Amino acid sequence: MKTSKMICAFLLVLVVGTFNDISGAYGEYVEDQHSFKIERRFPPCVEVCVQHTGNVKECEAACGE
């Protein structure tokens, strides 16, 4: 009987530890996904142009914005 209680306790600790690891990993995954979101300040045409040239006014004129 003592052995079965020890086995149950061990399995419980194992399950709780695994759950904590999985939930922690998922939390990190969610944070990473949010950090990759890019805030757009300009329309897509201007945004791409600015990434290449760095000149906002020139890009707005070229894109007709």
Curated annotation (Swiss-Prot):
GO cellular component assignments: extracellular region
One Gene Ontology term of the molecular function aspect: toxin activity
Leader sequence segment: 1-27
UniProt-annotated location(s): Secreted
Superkingdom, taxonomy of origin: Eukaryota
Disulfide bonds: 45-63, 49-59
Primary location: secreted
Sorted UniProt keywords: Cleavage on pair of basic residues, Disulfide bond, Ion channel impairing toxin, Neurotoxin, Potassium channel impairing toxin, Secreted, Signal, Toxin, Voltage-gated potassium channel impairing toxin
Tissues expressing the protein: Expressed by the venom gland.
Propeptide section residues: 28-39
UniProt family annotation: Belongs to the short scorpion toxin superfamily. Potassium channel inhibitor kappa-KTx family. Kappa-KTx 2 subfamily.
Function: Potassium channel inhibitor (Kv).
Domain notes: Has the structural arrangement of two alpha-helices stabilized by disulfide bonds (CSalpha/alpha 2(S-S)).
Name of the protein in its database record: Potassium channel toxin kappa-KTx 2.6
Taxonomic lineage: Eukaryota, Metazoa, Ecdysozoa, Arthropoda, Chelicerata
